[in-house]
């Protein structure tokens, strides 16, 4: 996602500096050009050689390193950078930047940067809550630094409270959100549904399906990365929810119907990737249903058809995309669903096809519109999400 992007990773003198090494590695896996700048105090916690080995670039520490190229190094790097992040950021570095002090390689470079700048504080809770530190954070925010709030947890000083550097995965998501994609969906409101529904028959048992929500979550995440204002209405899943997205949890098909239809009128794009139950128990027992005999009959009734309702109430200019999971006659069944429910596009896949089932990290999809069908090869669900959004934006014009 970060191919061709240059990321400055500033590392300061904190016990959390070890996390920066993993972040550097994760950025390299995203194909970023990672330029690490350490303060002198940071070198007491991590050896610069570690970062040089992980990034393939020289780790900068000394502003007056004589082994420099002709360009004024901190200015040249600042001009080249697509994003700068200091993680961990000590109270000392934040105070310097808040007041415009430039006495080392990191501060001089950051003050020259015009790219997005992120600060991830890590320190003792009392230090973080100190009014002077908080004032400095406000100054940094007013000067277009984005502050990544620390987490609450057990700290190196044996205290417990705010001041813990977020996980590297969280820091990476902040970076990806800023520079991974062009913001071609900025200003659009997008509603995505994902995951299964659960239809209770008593306090213990329920009817559900094998959906994990991976495809819908990938779509919601890609919409967010491309600048959209995203609402994700999701059934219960075990996978991590995408960040920077408005999460609306539901359990039953009725709850999903209410949450989706209530929000639908204000959406520009609706992508319904959830696996919603078609039927639910006609009655729900207040007590656990006991075994009685060798057989049991469960009376079912139809659930609300969310996609049909959305198609019937689609506002002018709104784009409606559905999903179709089939085991046979995939194209015929999906075309019929597209027409019957007044969709702009339907994404079809076959459960029996290798790599396209529930719970996989890959998918094999066919995008069907009233005018054409586009079949794609096996790819990751993240890649498939990008292809789906590309097609939606093309069709919207």
Mark where each language-model region is:
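A cross-family phosphate/adenosyl-ligand binding-site feature
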Residues: 1-118, 124-213, 217-397
């Amino acid at each position: 996602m970060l191919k061709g992007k240059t990321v400055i990773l500033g590392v300061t003198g904190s016990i959390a500096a070890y996390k920066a090494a993993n972040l550097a590695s994760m950025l390299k896996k995203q194909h970023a050009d990672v330029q690490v700048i350490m303060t002198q105090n940071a070198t007491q916690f991590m050896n610069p050689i570690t970062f040089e080995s992980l990034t393939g670039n020289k780790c900068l520490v000394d502003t007056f390193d004589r082994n420099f190229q002709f360009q004024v190094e901190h200015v040249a790097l600042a001009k080249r950078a697509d994003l700068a992040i200091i993680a961990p950021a000590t109270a000392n570095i934040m105070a310097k930047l808040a007041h415009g002090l430039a006495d080392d390689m990191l501060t001089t470079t950051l003050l020259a940067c015009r790219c997005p700048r992120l600060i991830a504080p890590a320190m003792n809770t009392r230090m973080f809550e100190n009014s002077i530190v908080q004032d400095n954070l406000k100054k940094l925010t007013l000067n277009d630094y984005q502050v990544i709030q620390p987490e609450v947890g057990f700290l190196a000083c044996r205290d417990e409270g705010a001041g813990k550097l977020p996980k590297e995965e969280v820091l990476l998501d902040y970076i990806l959100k800023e520079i991974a994609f062009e913001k071609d969906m900025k200003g659009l409101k997008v509603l995505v549904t994902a995951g299964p529904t659960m239809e209770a028959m008593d306090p213990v048992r329920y009817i559900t399906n094998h959906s994990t929500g991976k495809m819908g979550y990938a779509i919601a995440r890609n919409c967010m990365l491309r600048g959209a204002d995203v609402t994700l209405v999701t059934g219960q899943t075990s996978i991590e929810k995408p960040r920077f997205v408005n999460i609306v949890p539901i359990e039953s098909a009725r709850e999903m119907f209410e949450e989706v239809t209530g929000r639908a009128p204000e959406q520009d794009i609706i992508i319904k990737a959830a696996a919603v139950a078609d039927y639910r128990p006609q009655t729900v027992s207040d007590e656990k249903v006991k075994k009685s005999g060798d057989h049991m009959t469960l009376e079912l009734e139809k659930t609300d058809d969310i996609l049909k309702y959305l198609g019937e109430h689609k506002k002018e200019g709104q784009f409606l995309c559905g999903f179709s999971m089939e085991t046979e006659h995939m194209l015929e069944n999906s075309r019929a669903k597209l027409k019957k429910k007044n969709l702009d596009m339907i994404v079809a896949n076959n459960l029996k096809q290798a790599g396209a089932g529930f719970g996989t990290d890959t998918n094999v999809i066919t995008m069907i519109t009233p005018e054409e069908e586009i079949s794609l090869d096996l790819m990751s669900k993240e890649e498939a999400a990008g292809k789906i959004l590309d097609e939606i934006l093309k069709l919207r014009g």
